[in-house]
């Protein structure tokens, strides 16, 4: 997917990029690849692959969660790595207020430099573990309209990292690939225990590559019990699974 095909694919979804936004994506790509030569940010570096598997893929939640397009949501992105999905969403929908949490400081350094390069405002980057960022005494607990995570762990684990950060009435949106149905089948306990309710599992394929993708939307319907998230590492070692 070259930049022109990227623009056309988004237009087909009712998203029209401005010339400024197209340039921001071009600059994002150049800076990502240049930085990646000395900091391991991504294994995907060819331009068509970055545009498809990072940029386009990151924007797919807006195909299913229309509030992303118009509302000034507070969005927290857990384990965003090189900024996916939240920074492509921020470029296209600048009214979003974006917070990124990542456990590796070198990624946070990259994100700060990238945000300056792209002239992004309304973004904040935190070097922290998600378990601590949304912990029972944390200022950010239940503080966000929307929390996103992209393929960083299976659904039962992601739910424990992300749902504590979502306001009651807000949503957790997970960007997943294959195996999502299997993960959801054993994640009901985690989702319910943490105050969530499965609202949608939207299955589709990426253009060009045809790779399977899922957008999983979980509504936050009640407060997360104080004992969650458990201490760093525990959600992964002892997941809340059915």
UniProtKB/Swiss-Prot annotation:
SUPFAM superfamilies: S-adenosyl-L-methionine-dependent methyltransferases. Its EC number is 2.1.1.-. InterPro entries: rRNA_ssu_MeTfrase_G, SAM-dependent_MTases_sf. Coiled coil: none annotated. Its main location: cytoplasm. The keyword Hydrolase does not apply. It is an enzyme of class 2 (transferase). It comes from the Bacteria. Keywords: Cytoplasm, Methyltransferase, rRNA processing, S-adenosyl-L-methionine, Transferase. It is found in: Cytoplasm. Specifically methylates the N7 position of a guanine in 16S rRNA. This is Ribosomal RNA small subunit methyltransferase G. The lineage of its organism: Bacteria, Bacillati, Bacillota, Bacilli, Lactobacillales.
């Amino acid at each position: 997917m070259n930049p022109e095909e990227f623009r056309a694919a988004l237009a087909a979804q009712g998203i029209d990029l401005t010339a400024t936004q197209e340039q921001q994506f071009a600059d994002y790509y150049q800076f990502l690849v240049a930085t990646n030569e000395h900091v391991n940010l991504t294994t995907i570096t060819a331009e068509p692959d970055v545009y498809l598997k990072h940029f386009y893929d990151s924007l797919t939640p807006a195909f299913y969660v229309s509030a992303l397009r118009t509302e000034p949501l507070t969005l927290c992105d857990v384990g965003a790595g090189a900024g996916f999905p939240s920074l492509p969403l921020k470029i296209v929908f600048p009214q979003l207020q974006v917070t990124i949490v990542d456990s590796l400081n070198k990624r946070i350094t990259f994100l700060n430099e990238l945000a300056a390069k792209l002239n992004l405002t309304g973004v904040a980057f935190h070097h922290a573990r998600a378990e601590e960022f949304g912990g029972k005494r944390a200022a950010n607990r239940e503080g966000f309209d929307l929390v996103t995570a992209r393929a960083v762990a299976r659904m039962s684990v992601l739910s424990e990292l992300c749902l504590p950060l979502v306001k009651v009435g807000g949503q957790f949106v997970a960007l997943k690939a294959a195996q999502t149905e299997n993960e959801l089948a054993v994640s009901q306990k985690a989702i319910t225990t943490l105050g969530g309710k499965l609202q949608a599992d939207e299955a589709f394929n990426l253009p060009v590559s045809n790779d399977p993708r899922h957008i999983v939307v979980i509504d936050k319907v009640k407060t997360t019990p104080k004992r969650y998230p458990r201490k760093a590492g525990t959600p992964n070692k002892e997941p809340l699974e059915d």
